[in-house]
């Protein structure tokens, strides 16, 4: 399989789009209505580079939760910061609820930058959490995506 064809196949279906709910522990302007604020976590799924989720200025750690009606299996997590406002995230982790209903960490990382694709073992869950543990300023993310790579043999 050619490289371009393989990439197109791996990133063809964003499983995060199948989420029935996305929420955040803090959203700028959420005291009004999280769903209506310009900085809603929904911005992570809208495909528009210039829309983004962010927290209030004083909040430098936060959690984003994706909930699915049915369990999803993935092994690639794409995170993207809105770089026009600067690279801010210094440390993050990805948590899921496992088959026993226990929350566990499946990946950890430092900076995200323009785009970070986190490689994991195949994971099946109906609840996924992106936990921003530390940031230089309020985190500003504009994309969250999940993929299942069945082509390459690369694992973490």
Regions of interest found by a model, annotated:
Residues 1-70, 74, 82-88, 147-156:
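Disordered, acidic Ser/Thr/Pro-rich linker "stalks" and the adjacent N-terminal cap
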Residues 57-62, 72, 83-152, 156:
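Trp- and acidic/polar-enriched beta-sheet ligand-binding modules for extracellular glycan
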